[in-house]
């Protein structure tokens, strides 16, 4: 069936900001789809609120709108652009929910706009829990005993009839949002209440738990002619009960007998046909490990996290082909872009094993609830490819970029047997390492299966690797044993630990004995057909399939898994670096480990190596490719941390040298540069002992900002107000040594701002200055920011410009750098310098029109700013106002304090742009999901330090028609100043109304809580904030953000004043 000619203009809905459950995979799939539609000759319109994406670059679609993903904003764009069709299945759950909401408003019927790909009825049938269950019964497909409920009482009554445990699955949500496993009545009441509040349809499925079954996923495709095919079958290491986004996943499936596979495959294809889905779809099934019985868990009628993983695991570009199917093409008409000879209807075949491990944020959130269940908690994931399951598993662990590089865990080794068993029964993010430790202690396969319900096959893989550790220790540096260990995925660092050597000695021994990796191609067909994919993974075999090109090449080091502090912004910069290299005639080689991103789309670079970002793996690639050099400026701290090891092994670091990178990161060297240039910075000291930290704080005077050197995302950074608090900080971050010093700075009050600068060694270009809306002390990644600045004087801008120029030249920056300033008493103080691309690159590139990463790449390769047509200094400011707002995922992470401070907590960002600051703010708040009505009620719980500031804000709330509720101390202060708030009883006070009831019963529309820096779980401020998050009441903890919100609300409200 040829493509449709009755449609010309297609509008695509993007997925919005990165949150837990919906990450960079949608940037990858949306970018692929937009380009595929353009390739077919259609005019495309894209709407997305996330500026940190390749998808929102000019040129990916014909018309790009960075606007809030709300019904109101989309309706305006639909009227303006009048597309023929709307494609919602590439925008994750947000895209689907918006399609349903737009349809209900009648705008699609009014404008005659058709839904492309999957029809509304199919979306509804797959997402509405009751309709889906009815369809399964019609098809004769088994589902767990369940009931769709719209009240907590119905949930409790059903659970009584089927017995506990039960699983709660809210309708129309993603990442298991609001769901969970309930073991008793109290747990069910709490989870069901939360799930009903979070479901757009106020609907939950209560399901008899089948926890312990094998969890199997099929990625399937279907076209309009009802051709269906399986792209990939994946099997979870963890049994049913843990969200698939929080599970280790193997592809292809490892433990299914042929009969089981065929039954489940038939079921998956039957479902996609019955739902009439056109495009890609994810089917989740549960298989009883003791029989052939299975249950259908759910169907996602859209591209998803799993489809991005399946695309990278197989090389089969699901989103690209789903977009082509949506416009009428069939699987037997579309050429497979990998082989270029076979058609898309051929099912991929794998002659390797892929392992995905989630990347959790618990290294940032040390007090978070780490237990895993049916609600997803991971921010990102890594993928590794090997010839065997063992090799792929160990490579995936090495890719995580956590303190744990292999299965040798110090924490697990130190646990008592009782603690160990508790960790095995109650799954957390680190359970794999405790399984390995249990085998070291002599636990049997049967013991561990009983404790974990994990399949014997997967446990046997871990047991085999633990046995091999023993053989390696016993044999010493033996050529045969080392070769076998490398084939099984053991890293040089692990072998060094086991043998009491250093990794360099292991590498030297390997090379001397010819134990070096070869690279195999990912070709979708297990080498059955000719293929020329430039997509490789390493293994220890004989034939090498990667050939060095005669063209000069440059290696670009990616940024690894998405995590808090290092998000999709760095992947954006990596992709632009690749584009610039290709324009300059170089072969661009990417090494990365993240399956969700655009940079690991093999069609982006000239060569892609899917490998852990460790020194060993990067050096193996440079040994083979012999690049001109490596670029580390765009891969975040991951790439910067590899620079000195690469240089020590003879790899040229292009751009700013390693010595100059160190000068910016090393406190004493940097302080000397500041002094030499006569610039201002807050008083600061470096301490290498616990007592040294305490002495430094005393000398500088409290409050002080304390942090370790060499960190990203403000990890372990805190504002400390007194000695007792500082001692608590040191107890939690006790690793203070000469190689791990602690920095102690005076904490200055003032406005923060930052610049990204590009320097060619002589000239320095500042594309723009971004002013932070929150006060100093809130991490720059969590602060709202505005460009151009709204309150900086001309004189301050000149100070910033001059300081940036001096620093860039003095630090011998060649490429890109980021500098943060604080404006205190009209003077600009330098806070910190990052000699690399920062998370602001995509935002500033979009709003200034200067493609910063491309410009910096050309500078790195010797093309001066003058040559590229740029002058030194601050670029002219734009006429439009642009506001960047952070987006958080607190509702997914229990026990994480939402109080904003110097440690970064946001997972994503949105942008609002308009002709005035107030309108841009309004859009940014709308994009971030801060839905506050024009009038209502606001609850104030304010720390004493902030009371003077709250008074004018409270008066402004009254002026626009808000009622004010406040706790006793805040209320007394407001009364003294002529305002009459309603007093609410604090947590430990008698009286009505009680503060938590006011929040739980939604008697307030906004909570403003600045009850500070004490983040102990039982502190009043923490409990109030958690209650607001759990009940989805908008919450603000910084008064500067409140001021910004008021400005946006005041813009939409009319004053009523008497004559």
Swiss-Prot record:
SMART domains: CPSase_L_D3, MGS
Thylakoid found in the keyword field: no
Region of interest: Carboxyphosphate synthetic domain: 1-401
GO molecular function: ATP binding; carbamoyl-phosphate synthase (ammonia) activity; carbamoyl-phosphate synthase (glutamine-hydrolyzing) activity; metal ion binding
Binding site for Mg(2+) 1: 284, 298
GO process annotations (BP): 'de novo' UMP biosynthetic process; glutamine metabolic process; L-arginine biosynthetic process
Pfam family, one: CPSase_L_D3
ATP-grasp domain mapped to chain residues: 133-327, 671-861
Catalysed reactions listed for this entry: hydrogencarbonate + L-glutamine + 2 ATP + H2O = carbamoyl phosphate + L-glutamate + 2 ADP + phosphate + 2 H(+)
Binding site for Mn(2+) 3: 820, 832
Binding of ATP 1, residues: 129, 169, 175-176, 208, 210, 215, 241-243, 284, 298
Named cofactor requirement(s): Mg(2+); Mn(2+)
Pathway: Amino-acid biosynthesis; L-arginine biosynthesis; carbamoyl phosphate from bicarbonate: step 1/1; Pyrimidine metabolism; UMP biosynthesis via de novo pathway; (S)-dihydroorotate from bicarbonate: step 1/3
Region entry Allosteric domain, spans: 930-1059
Coiled-coil features, chain-numbered ranges: none
Gene3D superfamilies: 3.40.50.20, ATP-grasp fold, A domain, ATP-grasp fold, B domain, Carbamoyl-phosphate synthetase, large subunit oligomerisation domain, Methylglyoxal synthase-like domain
GO cellular component terms attached to this protein's record: cytoplasm
SUPFAM superfamilies given in the database record: Carbamoyl phosphate synthetase, large subunit connection domain (SSF48108), Glutathione synthetase ATP-binding domain-like (SSF56059), Methylglyoxal synthase-like (SSF52335), PreATP-grasp domain (SSF52440)
Record-listed Mn(2+) 1 binding positions: 284, 298
Domain MGS-like residues, every copy: 930-1059
Positions that bind Mn(2+) 4: 832, 834
Domain notes: The large subunit is composed of 2 ATP-grasp domains that are involved in binding the 2 ATP molecules needed for carbamoyl phosphate synthesis. The N-terminal ATP-grasp domain (referred to as the carboxyphosphate synthetic component) catalyzes the ATP-dependent phosphorylation of hydrogencarbonate to carboxyphosphate and the subsequent nucleophilic attack by ammonia to form a carbamate intermediate.
Family: Belongs to the CarB family.
Function text: Large subunit of the glutamine-dependent carbamoyl phosphate synthetase (CPSase). CPSase catalyzes the formation of carbamoyl phosphate from the ammonia moiety of glutamine, carbonate, and phosphate donated by ATP, constituting the first step of 2 biosynthetic pathways, one leading to arginine and/or urea and the other to pyrimidine nucleotides.
The protein's name: Carbamoyl phosphate synthase large chain
Organism: Limosilactobacillus fermentum (strain NBRC 3956 / LMG 18251)
């Amino acid at each position: 069936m040829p493509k449709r000619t009755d449609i010309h203009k297609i509008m695509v809905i993007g997925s919005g900001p990165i949150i837990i459950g919906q990450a960079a995979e949608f940037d990858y799939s949306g970018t692929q789809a937009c380009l595929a539609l353009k390739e077919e000759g259609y005019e495309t319109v894209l709407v997305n609120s996330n500026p940190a994406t390749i998808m929102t670059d000019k040129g990916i679609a014909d018309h790009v709108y960075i606007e809030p993903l709300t019904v109101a904003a989309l309706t305006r764009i639909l009227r303006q652009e009048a597309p023929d069709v709307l494609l919602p299945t590439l925008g994750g759950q947000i895209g689907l929910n918006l399609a349903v909401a737009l349809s209900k408003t009648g705008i699609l019927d009014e404008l005659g706009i058709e839904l492309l790909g999957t029809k509304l009825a199919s979306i509804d049938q797959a997402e509405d829990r009751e309709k889906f269950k009815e369809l399964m019964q019609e098809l004769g497909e088994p589902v767990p005993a369940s009931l769709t409920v719209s009240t907590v009482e119905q949930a409790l009554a059903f659970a009584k009839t089927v017995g506990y445990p039960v699983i709660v699955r809210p309708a129309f949500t993603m990442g298991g949002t609001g769901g969970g496993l309930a073991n008793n009545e109290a747990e069910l009441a709490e989870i069901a209440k939360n799930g009903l509040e979070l479901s757009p349809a106020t609907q939950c499925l209560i399901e008899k738990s089948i926890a312990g079954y094998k969890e199997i996923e099929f990625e399937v495709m279907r076209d309009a002619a009802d051709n269906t095919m399986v792209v990939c079958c994946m099997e979870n290491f963890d049994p049913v009960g843990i969200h698939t986004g929080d599970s280790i996943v193997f592809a292809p499936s490892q433990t299914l007998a042929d009969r089981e596979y065929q039954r489940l495959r038939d079921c998956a294809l039957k479902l996609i046909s019955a739902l009439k889905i056109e495009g890609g779809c994810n089917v989740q099934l549960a298989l009883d490990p003791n029989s052939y019985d299975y249950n259908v868990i759910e169907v996602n009628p859209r591209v998803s996290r799993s489809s991005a993983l399946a695309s990278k695991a197989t090389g089969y570009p699901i989103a690209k082909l789903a977009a082509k199917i949506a416009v009428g093409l069939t699987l037997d008409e579309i050429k497979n872009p990998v082989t270029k000879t076979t058609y898309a209807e051929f099912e991929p075949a794998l002659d390797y094993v892929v392992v995905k491990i989630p990347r959790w944020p618990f290294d940032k959130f040390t007090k978070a609830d780490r237990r895993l269940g049916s609600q997803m908690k991971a921010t990102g994931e890594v993928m590794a490819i090997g010839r065997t399951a063992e090799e792929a598993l160990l490579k995936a662990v090495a890719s995580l970029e956590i303190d744990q590089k292999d299965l040798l865990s110090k924490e697990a080794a130190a646990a008592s047997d009782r603690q160990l068993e508790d960790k095995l029964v109650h799954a957390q993010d680190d359970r794999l390492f405790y399984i390995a430790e249990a085998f070291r202690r002599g636990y049997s396969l049967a013991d561990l299966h009983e404790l974990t319900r994990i399949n014997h096959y997967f446990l046997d893989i871990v047991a085999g690797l633990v046995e091999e550790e023993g053989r390696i220790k016993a044999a010493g540096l033996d050529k045969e044993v080392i070769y076998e260990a490398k084939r099984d995925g053991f890293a040089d660092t692990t072998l060094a630990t086991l043998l009491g050597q250093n990794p360099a000695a292991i590498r030297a021994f390997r090379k001397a004995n010819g134990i070096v990796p070869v690279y195999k191609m990912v070709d979708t067909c297990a080498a059955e057909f000719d293929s020329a994919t430039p997509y490789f993974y390493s293994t220890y075999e004989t034939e090498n399939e990667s050939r060095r090109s005669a063209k000069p090449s440059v290696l670009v080091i990616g940024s690894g898994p998405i995590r808090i502090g290092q998000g999709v912004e760095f992947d954006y910069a990596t992709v632009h670096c690749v584009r610039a290299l290709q324009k300059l005639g170089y072969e661009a080689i990417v090494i990365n480990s993240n399956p969700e991103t655009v940079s690991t789309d093999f069609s982006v670079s000239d060569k892609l190596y899917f490998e852990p970002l460790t020194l060993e793996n990067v050096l193996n690639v440079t040994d083979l490719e012999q690049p001109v050099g490596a670029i580390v400026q765009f891969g975040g701290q991951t790439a910067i941390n590899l620079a000195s090891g690469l240089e020590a092994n003879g790899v040229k670091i292009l751009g700013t040298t390693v010595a100059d990178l160190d000068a910016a990161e090393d406190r004493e060297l940097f302080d000397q540069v500041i002094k030499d240039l006569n610039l201002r910075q807050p008083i600061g000291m470096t301490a290498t002992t616990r007592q040294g930290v305490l002495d430094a704080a005393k000398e500088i005077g409290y409050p002080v900002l304390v942090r370790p050197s060499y960190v990203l995302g403000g990890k372990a950074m805190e504002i400390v107000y007194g000695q007792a608090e500082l001692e608590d900080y040191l107890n939690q971050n006790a690793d203070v040594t000469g190689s791990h010093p602690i920095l102690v700075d005076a904490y200055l009050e003032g406005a923060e701002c930052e610049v990204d600068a590009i320097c060619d060694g002589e000239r320095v270009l500042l594309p723009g200055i971004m002013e932070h809306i929150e006060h100093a002390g809130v991490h720059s990644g969590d602060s709202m920011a505005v460009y151009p600045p709204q309150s900086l004087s001309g004189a301050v801008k000149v100070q910033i410009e001059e300081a940036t120029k001096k620093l860039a030249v003095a630090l011998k920056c060649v490429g890109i750098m980021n500098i943060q300033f604080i404006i205190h008493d009209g003077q600009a103080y330098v806070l910190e310098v990052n000699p690399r691309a920062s998370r602001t690159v995509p935002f500033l590139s979009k709003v200034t029109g200067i493609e910063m990463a491309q410009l910096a790449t050309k500078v790195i390769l010797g093309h001066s700013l003058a040559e590229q047509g740029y002058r030194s200094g601050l670029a002219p400011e734009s006429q439009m106002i642009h506001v960047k707002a952070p987006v958080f995922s607190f509702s997914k992470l229990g026990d994480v304090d939402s109080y904003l401070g110097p440690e970064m907590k946001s997972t994503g960002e949105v942008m609002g742009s308009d002709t005035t600051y107030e309108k841009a703010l309004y859009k940014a708040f709308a994009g971030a999901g801060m839905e506050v009505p024009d009038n209502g009620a606001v609850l104030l719980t304010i720390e004493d330090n902030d009371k003077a500031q709250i008074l004018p804000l409270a008066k402004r709330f009254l002026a626009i028609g808000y009622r004010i509720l406040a706790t006793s101390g805040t209320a007394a202060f407001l009364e003294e100043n002529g305002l009459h708030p309603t007093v609410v009883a604090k947590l430990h006070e008698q009286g009505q109304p009680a503060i938590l009831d006011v929040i739980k019963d939604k008697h307030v529309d906004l909570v403003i809580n600045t009850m500070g820096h004490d983040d102990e779980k039982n502190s009043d401020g923490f409990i109030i904030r958690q209650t607001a998050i759990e009940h989805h009441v908008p919450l603000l903890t910084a008064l500067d953000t409140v001021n910004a919100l008021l400005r946006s609300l005041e813009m939409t409200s009319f004053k009523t004043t008497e004559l």
